[in-house]
Amino acid sequence: MGQDSIVIKGAREHNLKNIDVTIPRDKLVVITGLSGSGKSSLAFDTIYAEGQRRYVESLSSYARMFLGQMDKPDLDSIDGLSPAVSIDQKTTSKNPRSTVGTTTEIYDYLRLLFARTGIPHCPECGKEIKSQTTDQVADEILALGNGETTKAMIMAPVVTGRKGEFTKLFADLAKEGFVRVRIDGEVRKLDGEPLTLNKKIKHFIDVVVDRVVLKSSATSRIAEAVEKATSLADGRVLVQVLGESSTEAQSSYTSSGATGGLAENEHVYSLALACPEHGHSIDELQPRDFSFNAPYGACPECLGIGTSEEVNESLVVPDPSLSISEGCLVPFSTGNYYPQVMKALCKHLKISDKTPWEDLPTKAKRAIMDGTGDEKIRVDYLTVSGRETYWFITWEGARAAIIQRRDEASSDKQREKLNAYFSQHPCPACKGKRLKPEILAVTVGGKSINEVTALSARESLEFFQSLEFTGQNRTIAQPIVKEIIARLQFLVDVGLDYLTLDRATASLSGGEAQRIRLATQIGAGLMGVLYILDEPSIGLHQRDNDRLIATLEHLRDLGNTVIVVEHDEDTIRSADYVIDMGPGAGENGGYLVAAGTPEQIQNAGSASITADYLSGRRKIEVPATRRQPQKGYISLTGAQVNNLKNVSVDIPLGTFCVVTGVSGSGKSSLITDTLALALANRVNHAHKTAAPYKKLTGVEAIDKVINIDQSPIGRTPRSNPATYIGLWDDLRALYASTNEAKARGYAPGRFSFNVSGGRCEACKGDGQIKIEMHFLPDIYVPCEVCGGSRYNRETLQVTYRGKNIAQLLDMTVEEALAFFQNIPGIARKLQTLFDVGLGYIRLGQPATTLSGGEAQRVKLASELQRKQTGKTFYILDEPTTGLHFEDVRQLLSVLQRLVDSGNTVLVIEHNLDVIKSADYIIDMGPEGGDRGGKVIAHGTPEQIVKANVGYTGKYIAKML
């Protein structure tokens, strides 16, 4: 049994109820169930944690110190485990150096290919750079002759565009027996009158080594002259073909071939890897030269990042209709010092501080932004205490002042505030290409490494499939190209054919990042591994789902066990084995409701909500009517970031509007990067850099824009759902109002674990202590003083209805809702969390443990409790992430409730149940990447189906 199955006995991690589970090995297994039913507790916190822990324990203590310590999960036993690999959505690299190419290791193979088979070119003239032997150069010179009478002058270009008199050079050359030199195109004798040159201008000096007739009998003489010339001129030789006349041609050309276009009868050769014309030399190529993370090839200006940071004037002056006295220069508009400096600066520049910024002379604006040089400016200053004084300053400019303030900021908060005035620009030296010019001039198949990485995965695949090599290069390139093609094919197979290899991983969505790691794992070709994935279908259009499922099956067919936590119906139906957790969430979950093949699950009893949806006993109904646009439109014109093709779009107000389209079609570029930021700037008076667009109209009909994204609600374990939705203040006030607290004189602050007073001082309110293990990983143990409760004994003695503050934090939202049902203010906030499907999370659950989808729904709950004006514009990006069919139904009712109140809800979504429930659909496409970026259809779901363009209509036709 242990050989063909993973057998788990008595799993009790988190909310698991001492369950026994048997999972077949080498199969595709889907774990499904409601949010909070225990899926991740079983897959990640039990199976993966134990598999990883056992593997790490088998290593030496030295190796273990570099790996994270994992606690033993709470279970009786687990047999049949393999080494486990987890592919989740939280571990995306935010390093600006990490790209799709580096993550998938394709870039490593590209570096090897370019180093071994790349053809170097001169970055200036584009000519191929080749190293040649003396004999090869001699043969090429010989080939310049037209018969037995053609003569040539062989020269050594010793000075190429340098200033000076070169008296010593001429003396040394004469001593060595040379008779003639060509100076700036004119041949002069060394043994005649002393040569005097103007030391203030650049000169070109070529030593005449020999004059020969280009005939085969002179081969050894030519080779000898080449050898002599190259020894004088760092491996270079200049040849002037003289024709049949014995007289020396006086070239009007004033270069020895070092700075540009040679005369027709002149030729330069090089023994080294260097451009004979421009002198650009290159060492023998190594893979490290093509790495933007190594100093050998990285652009010296940006050190390989490709961008430089600059203070952006439009962020410093977000509203140019304001004057300086009205605070148009936002970072200099508050406090006592800077407003007075600005006033003095205006006086010095002879401009009025009452004039709107947009009406100020350009010269004055430049002086304010970039400084007034060494000019002394008198500042008449009134201190806070009312004392008048003055002094003189030099003004370095607003940009320099902001940079200095950021560099000297004493807190992260202050630094973050000043960071808001900076924007990224392509590095002016490398134009964002990250590498040195001579490395960018190396080509394979006519493309530089930068041009190859700028291709999408699909285009790159086509490029390498059509690439041909000859001779020795074919033998070298074949195995490298094979690996590159295989990895590119995996990217295409997981639906990421639109991503370019130079795309930063920090800019990828959770689903995209996870599928990239999935492609990397397939590329590794391991067998006998246990892979655990967390919703790989996130962000994937139904069209791409079949390819993803085929990829998972391929991973299984290699001989691996693939466990997927998933809600997607197609994936569930494609599984070899399904485990359904439930029946409810939180304390009501943690049981194994059903297990078996998809067909067996479908016929499971009424306890399985999944079975009800798979069999069709339950379903999300199509709305009986669609809301008609009656409140006007938000109209965005001319959006053109990333792959958007000058897109214009109308969003009907007062409706539930869904933006759809295949992955990479431009949905996020249009909504997240352009519309959301443009609306925030216009309506919320934010200072954000929206992507380029021409016009935005209709904003007067809304009074607030709320973009509910999946970023964390807090970056530390001290932040939790209760603090985020404003419930924590109510709870602390409630405990402070109890008779016991009043008798002891406790204020609400006593019940905070962030400040001293009521918290446990042994662990500073963390509930755990970090123990440094030196060469072993640091371990965290519950605080012995407070037992992990975070509070001191006196604080915990204050109770409300028998529960102290620590016990309250440990309650789930559902439990707390029943507990506080008679306190409307608290119950209302808890109800919003429950309504968005978060009844299972604990009030004190650290923000760092919430998934992106959970964090997004906490934010949605926070918005739901605010007073509705009916004029709010909500934007959500894939809110169904991590949601079961039943959770989606619950979420839809919440979103429809917002629209019923008169608000507008705009959602980017792939879930067909959400799409079919929309009042209005905007479908992007037709494909991803360069083949997308257009609005291909818009209207009600029925109209999208009727339009019969793109893929979305085909899939929702089955749902209506």
Roles of regions detected by a PLM:
Residues 1-960:
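Conserved phosphate-binding elements of NTP-dependent enzyme cores
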